[in-house]
C-alpha cells in the first residue's frame, strides 16, 4: 500500500471519527491539515527512496555494460594470442554482464515510471494542502455566517412557522392532486363518449350499406 493510500484511509478515519463526535468543522479541517502535512513528509521520503533505487539500478546497468565491454576486449586479445578457450570464457562472461545490464536497465525503466507517478501524486498532495489552507479562512467565515443564521432562525420563530408552512404546502399538494385526478377522469369520459360516437357512426354505415344492397336486390327482381 502506497503512502497516498495510507493517507486517504487515515484522513477518512480521523474525519469520520470527529464528525461522529459532532466536532467543530474548523477543528476537522485543522486535523485534516495536520494529517496531510505529516503524510506529505512521509511521501517525500518515499519518493526520495524510489529515486535512489532508480539511480542504483542505472548505476548497476552501467557497471555491467562496462564489464561486458571489457570482457569482449579480453576475448579479442585472447583470440589474437591463440587461446580460443580463454576467448570463449571471456565472451561467456561478457554475455552474462550484458544480460545483467539489460535486466537492470529494464528494472530502472519500471522504477523511473514509479518515481514519475509518485512525483505527480506528491505535487497533487502539495496543491491540495495549499488549497485547504486557502479555504480554511473562508470556511471559518461561512461557519460564522451559518451560525448567525441559525440564531436568527431560533429567535424569530421561523423554525416553528416552518412546520405550519410545511403542513400547508402538503395540503396544497394534496388538493392539487385531487384536481388533477378529476380533470383526468373528465378527459377520460370525453374520450369514451367520442369512441362511442365513432362506433355508432360505424353501425349507421353498416345499416346504410345493407339498405342499399336490399334496394338493389328488389329493383333487380322487379325488372
From Swiss-Prot:
Alphabetical keyword list: Coiled coil
Coiled coil stretches, renumbered: 29-185
Pfam families, sorted: PspA_IM30
Family classification: Belongs to the PspA/Vipp/IM30 family.
The name this protein goes by in its record: Phage shock protein A homolog
Species the sequence originates in: Deinococcus radiodurans (strain ATCC 13939 / DSM 20539 / JCM 16871 / CCUG 27074 / LMG 4051 / NBRC 15346 / NCIMB 9279 / VKM B-1422 / R1)
Amino acid at each position: 500500500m502506497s503512502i497516498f493510500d495510507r493517507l486517504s484511509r487515515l484522513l477518512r478515519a480521523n474525519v469520520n471519527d470527529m464528525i461522529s463526535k459532532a466536532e467543530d468543522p474548523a477543528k476537522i479541517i485543522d486535523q485534516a491539515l495536520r494529517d496531510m502535512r505529516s503524510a506529505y513528509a512521509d511521501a517525500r521520503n518515499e519518493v526520495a527512496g524510489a529515486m535512489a533505487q532508480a539511480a542504483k539500478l542505472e548505476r548497476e546497468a552501467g557497471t555491467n555494460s562496462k564489464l561486458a565491454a571489457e570482457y569482449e576486449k579480453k576475448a579479442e586479445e585472447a583470440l589474437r594470442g591463440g587461446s580460443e578457450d580463454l576467448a570463449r570464457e571471456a565472451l561467456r562472461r561478457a554475455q552474462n554482464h550484458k544480460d545483467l545490464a539489460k535486466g537492470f536497465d529494464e528494472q530502472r525503466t519500471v522504477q523511473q515510471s514509479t518515481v514519475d507517478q509518485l512525483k505527480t501524486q506528491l505535487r497533487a498532495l502539495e496543491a491540495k494542502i495549499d488549497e485547504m489552507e486557502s479555504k480554511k479562512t473562508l470556511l471559518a467565515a461561512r461557519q460564522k455566517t451559518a451560525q448567525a443564521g441559525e440564531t436568527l432562525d431560533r429567535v424569530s420563530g421561523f423554525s416553528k412557522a416552518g412546520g405550519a408552512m410545511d403542513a400547508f404546502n402538503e395540503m396544497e399538494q394534496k388538493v392539487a392532486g385531487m384536481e388533477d385526478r378529476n380533470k383526468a377522469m373528465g378527459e377520460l369520459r370525453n374520450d369514451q363518449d367520442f369512441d362511442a360516437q365513432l362506433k355508432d357512426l360505424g353501425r349507421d354505415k353498416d345499416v346504410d350499406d345493407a339498405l342499399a344492397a336490399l334496394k338493389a336486390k328488389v329493383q333487380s327482381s322487379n325488372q
